[in-house]
A protein has these predicted regions:
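N-terminal small/polar loop signature for handling phosphorylated ligands or for N-terminal nucleophile
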Residues: 1-64, 75, 237, 241, ...
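General beta-strand structural signal in soluble alpha/beta enzymes
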Residues: 7-9, 30-32, 53-57, 69-71, ...
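Divalent metal-coordination and catalytic microenvironments
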Residues: 28-30, 56, 88, 118, ...
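Glycine-rich, acidic loop segments that terminate in or are immediately followed by a histidine
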Residues: 43, 177-181, 237, 247-383
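A structured phosphate/pyrophosphate-recognition subdomain
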Residues: 59, 63-249, 289-307, 334, ...
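OB-fold single-stranded nucleic acid-binding module
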Residues: 346, 354-359, 384, 453-455, ...
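Accessory interdomain/linker segments of ATP-dependent helicases and helicase-like nucleic-acid enzymes
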Residues: 381-441, 447
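Beta-strand/loop nucleic-acid-binding surfaces
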Residues: 440-458
Length: 482
């Protein structure tokens, strides 16, 4: 028996089934990490005699009657933190058991990469175990290639937090911003039998030469990530002007309607994250969507069309406040078209007619809610009375941290600042503030400014500050300093 397998790649960061892209001769559609709530598409395919298998982890209102749904959120399976890739691994493991083979574990490195990228909770034993096993034996061509490329940033070892910062964002950027060809190169570089194939080089100055698919994929991802960062920063500048001009910070939820300016739909989630972190409140970043709605006469004849306006985009909850479920809040308002995804990272749509009503509703419902950030610290030290070795010991535990097992925050209080212990390094290019404590501990703040540096000077010669930060260690010529 010969199996004919087709696969398709979304043109952007869409989710779910797009019926027009499914060939007529297909008998089984497999939907990983999506489609639990594509009820109409399930029914349409079922009526054509096409079976649908959904392997997913997203929340849905009900279980589809027209598809086979494997979803840890819709049953009593205890590990709710397995993402789509984790659920696919569980499915493959069961297939191994049925067929008396052992293939699934060969892909544990990709399982780890996927679950880290999807920010799954490492407090669950099964999730932690799968990620640990996957990172212990990285054999996937692309994953290995990116580890080599990011070797300086990962010099302390391969950990969940290292992968989350230095590898996962490059995959994410390619999915959001890459061309179809660039995405295909990326996914094919993850295949054992294709990753190391020689293909025509696209590197500048190397026309006519060849390189492996992995080499090209890793370089592409870096270039795309740089493009994404530039596009994100440019959009942020425009959006922040809109926020100021329209006084949107007067509202409890920062809901931004992009009327004359449209943000790239593949960037709205990233931009919403940045806005949420800066303004410290839930964010809705919404593009204008205009649809033509037909108008019929009494005989059912179309006589004209009306413009239907809605606002659609990304929502982000503020994770440092007690407002811990933006999706639930939106649904309970009964004023949104949809709020789909995770509790605090989701897609949102609202009609133009309901928008002002929703703003008034949220302002009233959250009138007494304080979004002031609360930093829960694990240690409180005093500026002249702690051991630098404590900072080093915490820094050496970096392999443990990840989503749900957050890297410890440390507060240091009563730090005396004077001209002799503070300096602004690289003030013109990348201003970095450095404060040196009596015990040799260095306090470093990147992306500082001349203004911030000058605030640390006093006419009396000394000021006192408190800081909150994370622990790092510096190794130079074999000497370790906090």
């Amino acid at each position: 028996m010969q199996n004919n397998i087709y696969y398709r790649i979304h043109t952007g960061k869409q989710h779910g089934i797009i019926l027009d892209t499914i060939p007529d001769d297909v008998k089984l559609v497999i939907c990983p990490d999506s489609s639990s709530n594509d009820y109409e598409q399930h029914q349409s395919l079922s009526q054509k005699g096409v079976d649908v298998l959904v392997i997913d982890h997203h929340e849905a209102d009900q279980i589809s009657q027209y598809a086979c749904i494997i979803n840890n959120q819709l049953c009593d399976y205890p590990t709710k933190s397995l993402s789509g890739v984790g659920m696919v691994y569980k499915f493959c493991s069961y297939m191994d058991e049925l067929m008396n083979v052992d293939f699934a574990d060969q892909f544990l490195d990709l399982v780890a990469l996927g679950m880290i990228a999807d920010m799954m909770d490492l407090r669950d034993f099964e999730t932690r175990h799968l990620i640990t096993k996957g990172l212990e034996n990285i054999r996937n061509p692309y994953f290995k290639g990116m580890v080599d490329k990011q070797s300086y940033s990962l010099k302390d070892g391969i950990s969940p937090i290292g992968v989350a910062f230095y590898i996962a964002p490059y995959v994410n950027a390619t999915i959001r911003m890459g061309t179809q060809e660039e995405k295909l190169i990326l996914f094919e570089s993850m295949l054992d039998y294709r990753g190391y194939e020689l293909i025509s080089s696209t590197k500048r100055g190397c026309k006519g030469q060849q390189e492996t698919r992995v080499e090209q994929a890793c370089r592409n991802c870096t270039n795309i990530k740089n493009r994404q960062t530039k596009a994100r920063d440019a959009a942020l500048e425009t959006i922040e002007r809109i926020i100021e001009e329209k006084k949107l910070l007067d509202n409890k939820i920062l809901a931004i309607k992009l009327d004359t300016f449209a943000a790239d739909k593949n960037l709205t989630g990233l931009i919403a994250n940045q806005l949420m972190a800066k303004y410290q409140r839930p964010v809705l970043l919404l593009n204008k969507v205009v649809e033509k709605v037909p108008v019929y006469d009494a005989l059912g004849k179309e006589i004209s069309t009306l413009a239907s306006i809605s606002w659609e985009g990304s929502g982000r909850g503020y994770d440092k406040s007690k407002f811990d479920n933006l999706r639930e809040f939106l649904k309970e308002s009964e004023l949104v078209m949809y709020a789909e995804g995770h509790a605090n990272a989701l897609g949102v749509g609202i009609t133009d007619n309901n928008f002002t009503t929703f703003i008034n509703y949220s302002n009233q419902a959250l009138a007494d809610f304080d979004f002031t950030p609360c930093y829960k610290v694990d240690f409180i030290f005093y500026g002249d009375d702690f051991r630098g070795s404590d900072i080093v010991e915490i820094a050496e535990l970096k392999s443990l941290w990840g989503q749900g097992v957050e890297e410890p925050l440390v507060a240091i209080e009563h730090i005396n600042i004077h001209n002799g212990n503070v300096v602004l390094m690289s003030p013109d290019k990348s201003p970095t503030l450095k404060i040196t404590l009596p015990n040799g501990t260095s306090l470093i703040k990147f992306k500082s400014s001349q203004e911030e540096y000058e605030k640390l000077h006093s006419e009396t010669g000394c000021i006192t500050i408190n800081i909150v930060g994370r622990c790092e260690r510096n190794i130079w010529n074999g000497i370790v300093t906090p």
